């Protein structure tokens, strides 16, 4: 006892400070961890005690004391702080140090209006409750559990937590497994463990499988899925990708679509390449159009006005092709100088670059800018067809054009990139040449984080004519329509019909334009933790579960806009990515960029690609192929590796397809019969979920060995995972690497990936030069990369810094 010091309990009672009660928790928090000592923690914390302190303050003091001790040579204080936080969380949710029954959790969540009613009735809750593994909470770092608490744990209206970590993971798993009722889905070796006549038993089998990979941190679903699966607002998708048509109906219909998607937390990537340029025609009047910038200004205001459920402003990336006449104004969008009415500081500009532009840069040639009003079909073409049409337009005298030096435009692009981090660079032809669904459209842009590459299509419009008798008829805008005006019969275009006209003797009442056939792509994401899943055996075990789980997201998702649901159900696109590559390398004592590194990731991503494709083909046998399968490259037995960049293939000396564990020949034949998913793999940024799972971010090297993260509690020191004398030198900070190594590693991964990678480049100001940047991005283009995300720069003098997360897409994390 400590005379004179009393503690105020949670219920308001006072009692003398009893250090033995505190010691019970400090001992448990330090148990089994090297380099930490409970007595040291108590000694430092005791000095801060005072009379009348609350139990919450004691807990906060202990946690803060442990957090302050986190350092490169004492990383395990991270886990001490995490355990102390967990003990407090247990008490806040259950009133004791432990888990309550799953049924109690669901009932409380339903009463609070936060958990979807009816979900718990689909399962044997006693069975699932006994399967929960509370000991897996010990995996959390302090920042990991704090991130889970701040962003993902469900809370009631008074902001009190109502779930514990393993309940969260089980709730997500149950939500994603609720449609699994087919007894044929159970593998033969497990059929004796399941009552095949009981849907609850079948669902429970898959819920356990999903729970295991999530709760072991082998796979983590993206933020929207982790946040919203199990809740009444089950919007599970990360990002949306769309394209705008060049008419007033298309523009404002897209604004509404963007607003609704942003309202429910989705990141957005949108193609504006069709919008006519400044000074273009409107209704045959020259110099009437204001160009793309005023429309982007409105888009910027939408991002601010329609924030994401009041938590953060919307996030929208806007794409144009570099032949657009407004390209120079577009590059100035985020400048702090110049006319403010032509700035859009809250957007994320991105370029959709054709091969021809890069060739003109290489040969120091001229580049011709066009008005999309006159050359809009260029947005529908890529490769040789694009080049042929582009050169044809260059040679036509009747086309509005402007010539610039390609190299000068490229220099301006790279300068803006270095100064602002934008525009993101995406390569149109590299994307479309490897489009597994080129039979059903064209890829027009990427998403906010530049890893999603799927077909999109702007709305096409028909003229809907409603007659005074209530009947309706539809015409294309350019159809020739015979109409009468009084006694005079004339032929007008569909878009010129008015309410003064008669058609076939019927008086026109109203004329409207209605949208048809648009496509807005959807990103449903999860990431494999390479620090835990990196052997052929483990990949074969985990990847099939992840693919099945992601496929279920498509059917269980809430779609804010019908077009997104229609598109997603037609192509059934998912994006399985990866994180923890830097941790894997450090733990295996492999230097970043070494031949051993490049060979290892080649082998790992071959395995992930193989099992992702195989699982999707098997799901097609079980549940049916995606509706747009026929005519796809999949249907012809063409796999992503078959269209891989030839130069990228030379980066690793490996005999492709020689590994006995991957029977690619048989897989090709299986794939020809059906694929469940039109798109399969994409590597997203994973910022939040990598923090949560205590691994390194996505496929990148670490920024620092130690840095600070900022959250509601202040600055939290962070040390790279499993740091020791054995791993220290293998955690090479990103800014110390030759960035061409990052590009080569990305090219090796890209061989196996049907979509793309969110790839950042890291430059210190003393190494930055136009020549170096040109070499990096030219190399990426030549090696078949589809995109580059941020260009991050910092001074070489910076030793420890606060990580800036403000520029990251919350959804793709």
Describe the predicted segments one by one.
Residues 44-45, 63-66, 81-87, 213, ...:
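A glycine-rich phosphate-binding loop feature that marks nucleotide/adenosyl-phosphate handling sites
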Residues 1-3, 13, 36-175, 179-211:
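Core nucleic-acid recognition elements
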Residues 39-51, 55, 277-316, 512-522, ...:
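A structural-propensity feature for long, helix-poor, extended segments
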Residues 119-129, 133-147, 453-454, 550, ...:
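Catalytic alpha/beta core of large soluble enzyme barrels
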Residues 88, 92-135, 237-517, 521-527, ...:
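Active-site cavity-forming subdomains of large catalytic enzyme subunits
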Residues 213-216, 222-224, 543-565, 591-686, ...:
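Internal maturation/activation junctions in enzymes
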Residues 92-97, 136-304:
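Long, structured ligand/cofactor-binding scaffold of large enzymes
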Residues 53, 68, 140-155, 214-227, ...:
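Core structural elements
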């Amino acid at each position: 006892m400590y005379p004179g010091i009393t503690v105020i309990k949670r219920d308001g009672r006072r009692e003398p400070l009893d250090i033995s009660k505190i010691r019970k928790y400090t001992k448990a928090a330090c148990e089994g961890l090297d380099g930490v000592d409970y007595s040291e923690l108590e000694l430092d914390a005791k000095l801060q005690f005072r009379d009348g302190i609350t139990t919450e303050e004691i807990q906060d003091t202990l946690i803060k004391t442990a957090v302050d001790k986190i350092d490169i040579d004492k990383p395990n204080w991270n886990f001490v702080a995490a355990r102390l936080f967990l003990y407090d969380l247990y008490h806040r949710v259950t009133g004791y140090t432990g888990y309550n029954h799953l049924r109690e959790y669901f009932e409380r969540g339903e009463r609070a209006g936060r958990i979807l009613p009816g979900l718990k009735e689909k399962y044997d809750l006693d069975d699932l409750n006994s399967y929960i593994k509370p000991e897996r909470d010990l995996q959390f770092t302090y920042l990991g559990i704090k991130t889970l608490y701040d962003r993902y744990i469900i809370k009631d209206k008074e902001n009190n937590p109502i779930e514990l970590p393993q309940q969260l993971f089980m709730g997500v798993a149950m939500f994603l497994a609720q449609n699994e009722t087919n007894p044929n889905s159970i593998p033969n070796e497990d059929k004796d463990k399941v009552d095949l006549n009981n849907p609850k038993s079948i669902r429970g089998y898959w819920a356990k499988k999903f729970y295991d990979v999530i709760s072991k941190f082998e796979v983590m679903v993206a933020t929207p899925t982790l946040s919203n699966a199990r809740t009444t607002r089950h919007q599970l998708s990360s990002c949306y990708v769309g394209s705008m048509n060049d008419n007033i109906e298309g523009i404002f219909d897209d604004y509404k679509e963007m607003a609704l998607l942003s309202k429910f937390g989705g990141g957005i990537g949108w193609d504006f390449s069709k919008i006519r340029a400044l000074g273009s025609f409107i209704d045959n009047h020259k110099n009437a159009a204001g160009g793309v910038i005023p429309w982007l200004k409105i888009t910027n205001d939408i991002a601010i006005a329609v924030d994401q459920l009041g938590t953060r402003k919307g996030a929208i990336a806007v794409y144009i092709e570099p032949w657009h006449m407004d390209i120079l104004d577009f590059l100035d969008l985020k400048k702090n100088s110049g006319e403010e009415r032509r700035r859009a500081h809250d957007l994320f500009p991105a370029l959709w670059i054709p091969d021809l532009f890069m060739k003109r840069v290489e040969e120091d040639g001229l580049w011709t800018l066009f008005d999309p009003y006159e050359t809009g079909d260029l947005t529908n073409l890529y490769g040789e067809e694009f080049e042929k049409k582009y050169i044809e337009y260059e040679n036509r005298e009747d086309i509005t054009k402007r010539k610039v030096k390609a190299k000068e435009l490229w220099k301006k692009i790279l300068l803006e990139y270095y100064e602002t981090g934008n525009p993101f660079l995406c390569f149109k032809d590299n994307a479309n040449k490897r489009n597994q669904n080129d039979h059903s459209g064209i890829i027009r842009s990427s998403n906010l984080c530049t890893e999603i590459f799927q077909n999109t299509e702007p709305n096409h419009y028909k003229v809907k004519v409603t007659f005074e008798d209530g009947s309706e008829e539809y015409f294309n805008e350019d159809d020739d329509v015979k109409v009468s005006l009084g006694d005079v019969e004339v032929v007008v275009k569909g878009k010129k019909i008015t309410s003064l006209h008669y058609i076939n003797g019927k008086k026109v009442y109203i004329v409207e334009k209605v949208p048809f056939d648009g496509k807005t792509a959807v990103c449903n994401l999860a990431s494999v933790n390479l620090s835990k899943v990196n052997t052929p055996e483990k990949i074969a075990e985990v990847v099939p579960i992840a693919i099945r789980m992601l496929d279920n997201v498509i059917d269980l998702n809430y779609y804010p806009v019908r077009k997104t649901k229609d598109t997603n159900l037609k192509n059934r696109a998912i994006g399985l990515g990866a994180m923890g590559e830097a941790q894997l390398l450090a733990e295996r004592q492999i230097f970043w960029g070494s031949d051993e590194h490049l060979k290892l990731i080649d082998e790992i991503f071959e395995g992930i690609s193989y099992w992702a494709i195989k699982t999707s083909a098997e799901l097609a046998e079980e549940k049916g192929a995606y509706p747009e399968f026929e005519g796809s490259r999949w249907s012809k037995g063409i796999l992503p590796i078959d269209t891989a960049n030839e130069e990228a293939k030379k980066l690793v000396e490996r005999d492709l397809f020689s590994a006995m564990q991957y029977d690619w020949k048989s897989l090709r034949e299986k794939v020809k019969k059906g694929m469940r998913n039109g798109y399969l793999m994409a590597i997203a940024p994973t910022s939040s979920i990598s923090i949560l799972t205590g691994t390194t971010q996505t496929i990148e090297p670490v920024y620092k060995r130690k840095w600070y993260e900022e959250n509601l509690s202040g600055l939290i020191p962070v040390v790279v995972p499993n740091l020791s004398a054995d791993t220290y030198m293998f955690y090479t900070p990103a800014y110390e690497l030759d960035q061409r190594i990052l590009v080569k590693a990305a090219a090796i991964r890209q061989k196996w990936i049907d979509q793309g990678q969110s790839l950042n480049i890291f430059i210190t100001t003393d190494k930055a030069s136009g020549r170096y940047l040109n070499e990096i991005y030219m190399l990426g283009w030549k090696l078949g990369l589809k995109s580059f995300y941020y260009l991050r720069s910092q001074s070489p003098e910076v030793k420890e810094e606060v990580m800036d997360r403000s520029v990251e897409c919350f959804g793709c994390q």
